[in-house]
């Protein structure tokens, strides 16, 4: 034994599941590899079941802790054996990816199905560990044929009462079948202490409480990484030594993956570099008809040289091809993010930021030192993005194109709900407990909140629920589909990563998260959806149909229009892109944008980075002349002049590091990435010494260097790229101009593009009416599916509500109404039902929505008329209506009309609900929104209104903005975190809210700082008014 103790200096665990096995493994790869390193393991195989979803994270953890990673997967064949497959080399890895892909593609999302015939494919490079059941001889013969000289019999012992007998039986079987036995741990957790969580996850996975899951639970906590000494006491020496022989054979590393971008876009006679240059030159001629400036030419040459050096030409060509397809289909699109720093992207038509008008920092997008590929995000109209997605699938085929996965992780409410169910709490308690987490929380509920909900925080069962919830938060829950991140490859994707079915038909998704792609050098194209692009395109269509002439576009909108900036400065921005939130609207009268770059700052300044870095107030004071503008040096003046000496953008931090601390551009980008990750992973402190040393060497004071570093930390993961803000500001200006000069078309387009933005159609229509726009009701004689414009010579046309406004009404019914109405107007309800082939449900919806007023009278009459319409059967399709005697029916009351409007349309063109309640609100001494302008700062006030939105910006103060609406306008309410905690029910659930507080007034900006909340929802008596909540 003593000799063996000397020899037993290492071990390789060959069967281990991480938490990426989704509710099986109870430890992360980081935890597993950290413990494996402490215990002296030589290697650790991550073998999640039919999945490589967590293998990139495992690879990173293995490198961090210097323990060899063996890439593998556990699989179970239908009516066949259970195997652990390990990749010996690159060929084995590729075969494993193909096998997992086949299993996943043959089953619904979240499942897999593998049969024996699926293992008939070549399996070279894969080692197999067989975990035998009762059909040993037959299975072994078949497996030996599939894995010649690459098959072992796995022996898994977990200190069970029958371990000795089990070991003897398995060794006898191995000898009989002439298979080498090997020790395996079937590891599900890094340490024994995770057993309770592992049991809980098993119960969750099987939809049972732990108390009823005994058949599925492990009998003890031995499925953890055990010490070498413990393993020696369990397994014979030969079985442990065999693990190291297998580990020695498994030399595959993810670094061996060679990813190539598609090359078929390059025509004959060109290579990717020459074709990219050709397209760029074409773009230069189009973008600058009179020739590009020397500055732009120099920038483009520098970019093309670096793109060629790093081998990314095909990537740029692919994005350009996708954008060209969209533009050819007249789908509005625009690149954003760091790609807007690229003059080549502008020339190719991918982005819209003219490098002649902006200060580009290309290294924010691409640099030699940066160990990650470029990332180009392109927004498309949200209603037409699917056309672009299907184009990509058609162009490259399912084998070479797939969407990126997003790892959905457990958050507070979901974790506490699943744990509480598993521990057997009654359903009603589970719901209350989950609600205690709050919709914005990523933590288990606090003791105070539990007490408020009627729980005893010291209860043993509750303490157990909370302890397990804390462990479960952050664990992967399932793979979901990225909104539009594509991976496209020259070779079949399943030679790089497994591919599985997405939840949506006609889509496939790789098993890796978008963040994993950068680590292994895979390039992603983001085909994203943006509702504002749909709204802008609809606006242009409506204006062109109404006024004729040359079609308006984003590029042709008059620039730097004073009337537009005057409207923005008044915070009259409901519906406007990026500056419609209450936080943005509160800032607008203070910043008062007067030119385009002011909008770039406005978009970026109401963000957690500038706020937490204490940059907002200094900038505003300097802008308003309340504080002198000072620069620590002339060279930094060039960096910060555009933001009055205050760093607001990521690019400025990078430029500061380059100019003031002698960072290379690539080092500066590494600083940016460290900023983005430090709150989650640390890693920023080493820049403190580097930055300080560099700044001191350049003559800057130590306290200035310390202050700059603290501001960088304040940016944290929230620092906003200037290029991103500028791309968004283009859309901000375009939507602002439309709201100012074509308000009817803009409002109509917003409603037709909904859901999008902060405001519901009801709030958009209320805003339109406050701007004196005429709105007309839904009417089958005039309405189409979409809302439309009707003009009779007025400066601004009226908005006719479309049939899409009627909740539950089918688009196909609306299209038939439009089609048959073009031939001949409807005579009455019977004629409508017959010619448009409407069933009783559709006619009843039209009657209840008031859409039959022109054919049958008010709602009561219309409902009576609908009741007399015979069902539309083919035999009677051309028959006549049954004559009904005239019946006298009373007019609906105003209250009835209001209730019906909101129930069917979600809005009303009649009196605002609060106009009907104003008498009761006056009795409660509630002021209306008009009166706020006449009251002084600091005055106690009481207001009430419909809750139309809750917004919680990611700021240090934890406040929430609640927007109230009455018949005259909006009231902005600021709710502190402590008040929201104390009055959670009215804060979260009220639809009609009364607020007692203090009026805060600064210039034209007014808020009510809430001191007490009262839920007046019962006054609405069934009115269905819904808020739009954001965080």
Curated annotation (Swiss-Prot):
GO cellular component: cytoplasm
EC code: 2.7.7.7
Substrates-to-products reaction catalysed: DNA(n) + a 2'-deoxyribonucleoside 5'-triphosphate = DNA(n+1) + diphosphate
Subcellular location: Cytoplasm
Disulfide bonds: none
DNA damage found in the keyword field: yes
UniProtKB keywords: Cytoplasm, DNA damage, DNA repair, DNA replication, DNA-directed DNA polymerase, Nucleotidyltransferase, Transferase
GO biological process: DNA repair; DNA replication
One Pfam family cited in the UniProt record for this chain: tRNA_anti-codon
Domain of life, per lineage: Bacteria
UniProt keyword Transport present: no
PANTHER family associated with the record: DNA POLYMERASE III SUBUNIT ALPHA (PTHR32294), ERROR-PRONE DNA POLYMERASE (PTHR32294:SF4)
HAMAP family, per database record: DNApol_error_prone
Family: Belongs to the DNA polymerase type-C family. DnaE2 subfamily.
Known function: DNA polymerase involved in damage-induced mutagenesis and translesion synthesis (TLS). It is not the major replicative DNA polymerase.
This protein's name: Error-prone DNA polymerase
Species of origin: Pseudomonas aeruginosa (strain ATCC 15692 / DSM 22644 / CIP 104116 / JCM 14847 / LMG 12228 / 1C / PRS 101 / PAO1)
